[in-house]
């Protein structure tokens, strides 16, 4: 696994206000834990600890929300 911003299918981060929301999201996806990183590179976004390799993460490039 890796520590990273978990991504939605369009390479967009999950915006957040509370770490509890991110912890639930991350652990549901197989991570050890997660928290809301405030004022990070992509604003307030969920960051996961030890997220499985099969789960998409935010990478360089634009976020493509339809």
From Swiss-Prot:
Domain LCN-type CS-alpha/beta residue range list: 2-64
Keywords, in A-Z order: Disulfide bond, Ion channel impairing toxin, Neurotoxin, Secreted, Toxin, Voltage-gated sodium channel impairing toxin
GO cellular component: extracellular region
InterPro entries given in the database record: LCN-type_CS_alpha_beta_dom, Scorpion_toxin-like, Scorpion_toxin-like_sf, Scorpion_toxinL, Scorpion_toxinL/defensin
Disulfide bonds: 12-63, 16-36, 22-46, 26-48
Localisation: Secreted
One Pfam family cited in the UniProt record for this chain: Toxin_3
Tissue specificity remark: Expressed by the venom gland.
GO BP of this protein: defense response
GO function term, MF aspect, one: toxin activity
Free-text domain note: Has the structural arrangement of an alpha-helix connected to antiparallel beta-sheets by disulfide bonds (CS-alpha/beta).
Functional note: Alpha toxins bind voltage-independently at site-3 of sodium channels (Nav) and inhibit the inactivation of the activated channels, thereby blocking neuronal transmission.
Sequence similarity: Belongs to the long (4 C-C) scorpion toxin superfamily. Sodium channel inhibitor family. Alpha subfamily.
Protein name listed in UniProt: Toxin BomPI
Organism: Buthus occitanus mardochei
């Amino acid at each position: 696994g890796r520590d990273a911003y978990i991504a939605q299918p369009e390479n967009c981060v999950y915006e957040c206000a509370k770490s509890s929301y991110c912890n639930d999201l991350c652990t549901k996806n197989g991570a050890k834990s997660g928290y809301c990183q405030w004022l990070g590179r992509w604003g307030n976004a969920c960051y996961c600890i030890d997220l499985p390799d099969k789960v998409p993460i935010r990478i360089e490039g634009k976020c493509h929300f339809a």
